[in-house]
């Protein structure tokens, strides 16, 4: 039986679409980070961008991307739970786990 890699890499997109909006994802060098220093990622619903710090390891970058993606989806749905950081963090973490542990179905 073939070994299944449980730690697959999640590709961070340059852009994707939600509700007809193009969402741009930028991986930003720390020297150009314009957000609070404690933040490692930021969703901006005004200009439809997700910024991620480039000093993160692969797994942390994936988790932060998924966290900001959850904010983006919830904001596009106009759902107030987007302001609940604990919910968004848990959802983003579980989403990252699911996306990096898929075992593909043969067709």
Regions found by a protein language model. Name each.
Residues 1-4, 104-107:
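Short intrinsically disordered terminal tails
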Residues 63-75:
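Active-site recognition of the HExxH zinc-binding catalytic motif
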């Amino acid at each position: 039986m073939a070994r299944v890699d449980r730690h697959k890499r999640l590709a961070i997109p340059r852009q994707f679409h939600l509700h007809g909006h193009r969402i741009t994802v930028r991986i930003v060098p720390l020297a150009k980070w314009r957000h609070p220093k404690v933040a490692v990622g930021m969703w901006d619903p005004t200009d439809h961008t997700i910024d991620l710090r480039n000093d993160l390891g692969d797994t942390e970058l994936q988790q932060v991307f998924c966290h900001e993606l959850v904010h983006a989806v919830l904001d596009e749905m106009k759902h107030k739970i987007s302001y609940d950081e604990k919910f968004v963090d848990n959802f983003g973490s579980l989403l990252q786990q699911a996306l990096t542990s898929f075992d593909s179905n043969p067709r």
